[in-house]
UniProtKB/Swiss-Prot annotation:
Reactions this protein catalyses: (S)-ureidoglycolate = urea + glyoxylate
Annotated source species: Rhodobacter capsulatus (strain ATCC BAA-309 / NBRC 16581 / SB1003)
Name by which UniProt lists this protein: Ureidoglycolate lyase
EC number: 4.3.2.3
BP GO terms, sorted: allantoin catabolic process; purine nucleobase catabolic process
Family: Belongs to the ureidoglycolate lyase family.
Enzyme class: lyase
InterPro entries membership: RmlC_Cupin_sf, UAH_cupin, Ureidogly_lyase, Ureidogly_lyase_bac, Ureidoglycolate_lyase_dom_sf
Function description: Catalyzes the catabolism of the allantoin degradation intermediate (S)-ureidoglycolate, generating urea and glyoxylate. Involved in the utilization of allantoin as nitrogen source.
Keywords: Lyase, Purine metabolism
Amino acid sequence: MERLMIEPLTAEAFAPFGDLIDVLGPPDRLINAGLCGRHHDLARLDFDAEGRAGISLFDAQARTLPHVLDLVERHPLGSQAFLPLDGVPFLVCVAEDADGVPVRFRAFLTAPGQGVNILRNCWHGVLAPIGAPGRYAVVDRIGPGANLQEYPLPVPLLVEG
């Protein structure tokens, strides 16, 4: 089994695969008579013309490190954002595409409270909270069409931190 090492999650490192959703620095603007800071437009949401944005809640079972990555998926019709509701960090494994096959895997671990938006058609591992179960708000495409492609890895990867 090949090893995949977790690397630091930064906006720059994750940019080819999506967006880091985090409160970095002061808010972009103050709203509500100055009582609320708005961190504005943090993700590139992208849905085909037949779909719309929807918000779902996911309850995910805890995983541990090292983690065996044996299945990835992608969503050809829309992006998918994961926002932790309880602060549980989660593993984010992503890969480039080569003619329908995931290649050149990378692994990241969110800090408590960080979320990610995964770009449309980007291969990624399933939701994997580390150390405790997690609840997540997920913003993704709702609508007709096949928006899930799964790819079982012929040789699983061992993700280590």
